[in-house]
Amino acid sequence: MTAGTLAHRPLLGCIADDFTGATDLANTLVRNGMRTVQTIGLPDVGAVQDIGEADALVVALKSRTIPAVEAVAQSLAALQWLRAQGCRQFVFKYCSTFDSTDAGNIGPVAEALLAALDSDFTIACPAFPENGRTIFRGHLFVGDALLNESGMEHHPLTPMTDASLVRVLQRQSKNKVGLLRYDAVARGAHATAERIAALRSDGVRMAIADAVSDADLFTLGEACANLPLITGGSGIALGLPENFRRAGLLPQRGDAASVPAIDGPGVVLAGSASRATNGQVARWLEQGRPALRIDPLALARGEAVADAALAFAAGHGEPVLIYATSSPDEVKAVQAELGVERAGHLVEQCLATVAAGLLARGTRRFVVAGGETSGAVVQALGVRALRIGAQIAPGVPATVTLDAKPLALALKSGNFGGPDFFDEALRQLGGH
């Protein structure tokens, strides 16, 4: 990957702990006027040739659920690369539901990045009001429900059983965690900056920041303009482009989301077991569209499930849905038999194999549901970097690979998108 030109260096460098989260963040930046390139994993020399046009770079790692020591090492390597490109400020992006365990990885990674940047403070704000994620008095809400009553308490890898993010983050951090309360945020950027100064003087290294609206996120962005590191969900990046414009570093532009339309066959691959994805699969099936369910137990028995899926797709002249999505009870039953990690890995690898096989047969448009599944699929497709286009649904943009023969992809976190998302994504990727 070549560095930006001397005349134009990227301003913002971002590290995301999963692929769909990276795309979500990149979507936010593009919508707010920053041309954005997302890399898939740590970049290699020669992976992208036109980085010089990017205002923001997003490195998509797959570090959310790996051992904390590995997540720290990968994140520090990403930071080193982003600094070498000339980025001035950095964002560590994680899920808007704060997906983590007492072992990490949010706390350990944030503390390591702070140390590497020789900084003594950052905020942690996963709020994303547009998708119903808000924080008040340090407690995270998903819609009207507390985090631990939202369905996230059943997450197979990172069950979230405590809505107090101060407690959650403190349990996985060595340094003092505090709360940047709504009282300060509601009074504007100056009051918020004053409260940050008070927290710093009190020895707080990371503060959960309350936010219940986009206006609060813009306030936080302005108040944190001079912090080397900001951490949170994609919403925390809302106000950052305006900081750069205010400083005369970023021009107003209307073409940040410009990407080419991609013709050719399409497919939907769903590995998420979230409520939203279950609803999207149900809508597809209700409409009588062609679909094939992947059975993890059949995979465990060594059956040729991927071959059957490829044959199924070949037998239809329209996009098909290949899915492993099922109800929480069904997921638990499979996990009880196979183990959590093995069950997830089998599904991800099967869908990745199907994606690679479809690519070889000419498929050009891929809609993928689920963060872990998206990570496995983009790796199987050999995707190195993406240009970020217009939004399909909140948090989910259209993307196009930076290749001689580009592919179009929509990579969504499990819980994003309305019931008709699959159809909408296929249409938008094709320029319709």
From Swiss-Prot:
Give the first-level EC class, as a single word: transferase
Q: What is its EC number?
A: 2.7.1.217
Name the phenotypic consequences of knocking out this gene: Deletion mutant is unable to use L-threonate or D-erythronate as a carbon source.
Q: Which Gene3D superfamilies match?
A: Four-carbon acid sugar kinase, nucleotide binding domain, Putative sugar-binding, N-terminal domain
Any Pfam family: SBD_N
Name the Gene Ontology molecular function terms of this record. Answer: ATP binding; kinase activity
SUPFAM superfamilies assigned to the protein according to its UniProt record, in alphabetical order: YgbK-like
State where ATP binds. Answer: H155, S272, A324, G344, E348, G370, G371, E372, T373, G414
Q: Which reaction does it catalyse?
A: 3-dehydro-L-erythronate + ATP = 3-dehydro-4-O-phospho-L-erythronate + ADP + H(+); 3-dehydro-D-erythronate + ATP = 3-dehydro-4-O-phospho-D-erythronate + ADP + H(+)
Q: Does the keyword Secreted apply?
A: no
Keywords from the named record: ATP-binding, Carbohydrate metabolism, Kinase, Nucleotide-binding, Transferase
Read off the InterPro entries from this record: 4-carb_acid_sugar_kinase_N, 4-carb_acid_sugar_kinase_N_sf, NBD_C, NBD_C_sf, OtnK
NCBIfam families for the chain? OxoTetrKin
Family to which this protein belongs: Belongs to the four-carbon acid sugar kinase family.
Quote the function comment for this protein. Catalyzes the ATP-dependent phosphorylation of 3-oxo-tetronate to 3-oxo-tetronate 4-phosphate.
Name the record gives this protein: 3-oxo-tetronate kinase
Which organism is this protein's natural source?
A: Cupriavidus necator (strain ATCC 17699 / DSM 428 / KCTC 22496 / NCIMB 10442 / H16 / Stanier 337)
State the taxonomy lineage: Bacteria, Pseudomonadati, Pseudomonadota, Betaproteobacteria, Burkholderiales
Name of the gene = otnK
